[in-house]
Each structure stands twice: as structure tokens, then as C-alpha cells.
Amino acid sequence: HVAQVLVDILWKAGLSAESTKVLFLGWSYKAEVGDPRETPAEPLAEALQQRGISVSVYDPHIDPETFPDSVDVITDLTQATGHHLAVLVTAHKACVDLDWDGLALQMETPRVYDGRRVLDLESLEEAGWQCFAVGRPLGVNP
């Protein structure tokens, strides 16, 4: 279901899957833990990749060598460029309290999906982000 919501967000923005890059913020199964077992991120990434979407991951709690080969691992967010959507997958402090202004400048369009409902979406919207969240209708921020 979440994969289809993300595809809908991208489609409504006029993006085709083949040219789209998504950045996962977090990968582990719960916040502040470096354990990738049973993570919902892996099947979500696979579902997006099956649609032709490229997936990058930033998770400072997990050893970069343990990620699947199919994802692009980013260890420094200043290197995260050209993404069309950031997805907060895990509510690590490092993923919630990051430099959102800096990340916005590196993205094709500052667009975020809060999969944990922990971000201050109002502040992000004031800073120019298009914000979406689990449980929030897509039409709230066109």
C-alpha cells in the first residue's frame, strides 16, 4: 500500500517511474537501532524498484556493507543529490533532525513522505517542502 501511495505522489508530480530517484531516511526496523532484520524498508524498496524507481538509503545506524546491492547507500547526506522524494522510513534522531534546508537544495524538488508521523510538516511546508504523510490525504498539499 505505501509503495502505491509513493508512486501516486510521484505520478501526480508528473514524474515517470523510470527517471525517478527516492531517498529512504532510515532502514532499520525501529528508531536508534542498527538491526535491519524484519525491516519494512526492504519490501518497500523492492516494490518501488519493480516499478523502475531508483532507491537510495541513508541510515547512520547500519553498516553500509549490510544493505542489499540493489540500493544506493549514502553515508553522508551532503552527497544525496537529485532525488525526487525523501521518505522517512525510520524515526532515527539523525533522520528526523537533519538539515532539511540543506537537503532541499540537493533534491530535484523538496518533497517528503513522513512514514512515521514524527516530522513537523507545517514548518517543512513553510520552508518550501511538499509534505505527505501516512494517514494524511494526498490532496492536502498538491
Could you describe each region identified by the protein language model?
Residues H1-P142:
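Structural/interface elements that position substrates and couple domains in central-metabolism enzymes
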